[in-house]
UniProtKB/Swiss-Prot annotation:
<keyword id="KW-0315">Glutamine amidotransferase</keyword>
<comment type="pathway">
    <text>Purine metabolism; GMP biosynthesis; GMP from XMP (L-Gln route): step 1/1.</text>
</comment>
<comment type="subunit">
    <text>Homodimer.</text>
</comment>
<feature type="binding site">
    <location>
        <begin position="232"/>
        <end position="238"/>
    </location>
    <ligand>
        <name>ATP</name>
    </ligand>
</feature>
<feature type="active site">
    <location>
        <position position="180"/>
    </location>
</feature>
<dbReference type="InterPro" id="IPR022955">
    <property type="entry name" value="GMP_synthase"/>
</dbReference>
<keyword id="KW-0067">ATP-binding</keyword>
<protein>
    <recommendedName>
        <fullName>GMP synthase [glutamine-hydrolyzing]</fullName>
        <ecNumber>6.3.5.2</ecNumber>
    </recommendedName>
</protein>
<dbReference type="InterPro" id="IPR022310">
    <property type="entry name" value="NAD/GMP_synthase"/>
</dbReference>
<feature type="domain" description="GMPS ATP-PPase">
    <location>
        <begin position="205"/>
        <end position="403"/>
    </location>
</feature>
<feature type="domain" description="Glutamine amidotransferase type-1">
    <location>
        <begin position="13"/>
        <end position="204"/>
    </location>
</feature>
<dbReference type="GO" id="GO:0003921">
    <property type="term" value="F:GMP synthase activity"/>
</dbReference>
<keyword id="KW-0332">GMP biosynthesis</keyword>
<keyword id="KW-0658">Purine biosynthesis</keyword>
<comment type="function">
    <text>Catalyzes the synthesis of GMP from XMP.</text>
</comment>
<feature type="active site" description="Nucleophile">
    <location>
        <position position="90"/>
    </location>
</feature>
<keyword id="KW-0436">Ligase</keyword>
């Protein structure tokens, strides 16, 4: 596959060495929130490579391994001789202890998962301004049994004696909890202390700076070549359209492929918004029948995603011959897309991520190997909230910037089982009601996603003294900061009642509404 362009040219102030944690990219995001640039790299990165990058700090991420087991991932031990501050998080702390002469064993009592009060023993350096009793997020089955020479305890919990440690004279620190997770109430204080007080970083990573660097890199790589953008109308592709328009102007052609799986009224809104209001040329391609015919009889969700991804690119290739030629395909791929499609486990022999898939994403999992385009993906290192900030800075209005995330395969993966015209029409009407009532209640901007799901089973009901057999609709509303983790939104009963009453009365083919109250993990936000 052709090379990818992403906005990453500068040296990072903080390097995160990834040992397979699901939160490695989240650490990078938290650091960027402090306006300091960070980069995630493989744990196999050598000390010499790190020295050449000249970072001001190194973070060793968590991971699923145990340092005392054969095949556990280890970093280059020379990293501890670079004279650079190091913060070990969870597995990273255990690794540092193990490498520097301490010992790690399975937790003597029980594994510690979830929230735990942190009792601060030494409120200095890393734990400055961290209030004793603050809630921190734990996720570990091993514990430090013996500290290396010179290390001191900074904090403990009821189950973990060495919850935070330090070797002050070398600026080595470790925390058994995850400060990057939103559940850690003073986690950002810990991160800021490390980034600013210990590593002496300067705040030089801002939204406008990202835009300037992304524009410059796109211009450098694309040159005078033409770029074709897959425009969906969501915040990701819309932000990308504005960014590329700023970078290369008339070299950009936006193409909206209506695959028939959009929400109600979206194709019309998209065309009028970009073409009429912002004068950005958008080529409209009606491929509804092509897509749905390819899904006939298909019930496996992974197959649906692959087929939609394949057809999506094929249409692009065909239309590019008519409109082009084009050299580059632009995609609004984000960090969570890449993480969930590649898995997070690490092969200790190669240092590569093992593809333990959660599910393939439309942007990255459905691409055919014979793809004829080079890829332009300047947003692939950003989280959703960062993309919204970029879009806002580029001039996108709130009606686009604040739109809820919508999957590339659209309603096709919110209909469990086979996709039909009848089911699509039913789901569109139900989904519109969910979003209308959420908006009417003033909750739209307080919720990460709110949508409907159609189940491929029949539920018995009674309407007008008649027995009915119709589809149930699932209402899915979640709160999140980045899509990596999510919790179900506690909607007022009055809002839920309106949604339910309207759906069963206004949507043909539905006689039951249920509420999904599953968090992520263990579930995912989407049902397929």
């Amino acid at each position: 596959m052709a090379s990818m362009i992403s906005a990453e040219k500068r040296n990072p102030a903080i390097v995160i060495l990834d040992f397979g944690s699901q939160y490695s990219e989240l650490i990078a995001r938290r650091i960027r929130e402090t306006e300091v640039y960070s980069l995630v790299m493989s744990y196999t990165t050598s000390a010499d490579q790190l020295r050449s990058l000249k970072p001001k700090g190194i973070i060793l991420s968590g991971g699923p391994g145990s340092v005392y087991e054969e095949g556990a991932p280890y970093c280059d031990p020379e990293i501890f001789n670079l004279g650079i501050p190091v913060l070990g998080v969870c597995y990273g702390m255990q690794l540092m202890v193990h490498e520097l002469g301490g010992s790690v064993k399975p937790a003597a009592g029980k594994a510690e998962y979830g929230k735990a009060p942190l009792e601060v023993d030494d409120p200095t350096a890393l734990l400055t301004n961290v209030i004793s009793g603050s809630t921190m997020w734990m996720s570990h089955g091993d514990s430090v049994q013996k500290l290396p020479k010179g290390f001191v305890r900074l904090a403990h919990t009821s189950n973990t004696l060495e919850a935070a440690i330090a070797l002050h004279d070398k600026s080595f620190y470790g925390v058994q909890f995850h400060p990057e997770v939103v559940h850690s109430t003073h986690g950002m204080v810990v991160i800021r202390n490390f980034v600013y007080d210990i590593c002496s970083c300067e705040p030089d990573w801002t939204t406008n700076l990202f835009i300037d660097e992304a524009v410059s890199q796109v211009q450098q790589h694309v040159g005078d070549k033409k770029v074709l953008l897959a425009l969906s109308g969501g915040v990701d592709s819309s932000t990308l359209a504005f960014l590329l328009n700023k970078a290369i102007g008339p070299q950009l052609t936006c193409m909206f492929i209506d695959q028939g799986f959009m929400r109600k009224g979206e194709p019309e809104f998209l065309m009028s918004f970009f073409d009429e209001k912002f004068k950005i040329n958008v080529e409209y391609i009606n491929a509804r029948e092509r897509f749905i015919s390819q899904l006939k009889g298909v019930t496996d969700p992974e197959q649906k995603r692959k087929i939609i991804g394949r057809e999506f690119i094929r249409v692009f290739e065909e239309e590019s011959l008519r409109l082009g030629p084009f050299d580059y395909l632009a995609q609004g791929t984000l960090y969570p897309d890449v993480i969930e499609s590649s898995g997070t486990n690490i092969d200790p022999k190669t240092g590569e991520r093992i593809a333990v898939k959660i599910k393939s994403h439309h942007n990255v999992g459905g691409l055919p190997k014979d793809l004829q385009f080079k890829l332009v993906e300047p947003l692939r290192r950003l989280f959703k909230d960062e993309v919204r900030k970029v879009g806002k800075s580029l001039g996108l209005p709130d009606e686009i910037v604040r739109r809820h995330p919508f999957p590339g395969p659209g309603l096709a993966i919110r209909i469990l089982g086979e996709v039909t015209h009848e089911k699509l029409n039913c789901l569109r009407d139900a989904d519109l009601i969910v979003r209308e009532e959420i908006n009417n209640a003033g909750l739209y901007n307080k919720i990460w996603q709110a949508f409907a799901v159609l189940l491929p089973v029949y539920s018995v009901g009674v309407m007008g003294d008649q027995r009915t057999y119709a589809w149930p609709i699932v209402v899915r509303c979640v709160s999140s900061e980045d899509g990596m983790t999510a919790d179900w939104s506690r909607l007022p009963y009055a809002v839920l009642e309106k949604i339910s009453n309207r759906i069963v009365n206004e949507v043909e083919g539905v006689n039951r509404v249920v509420l999904d109250i599953t968090s992520k993990p263990p579930g995912t936000i989407e049902w397929e």
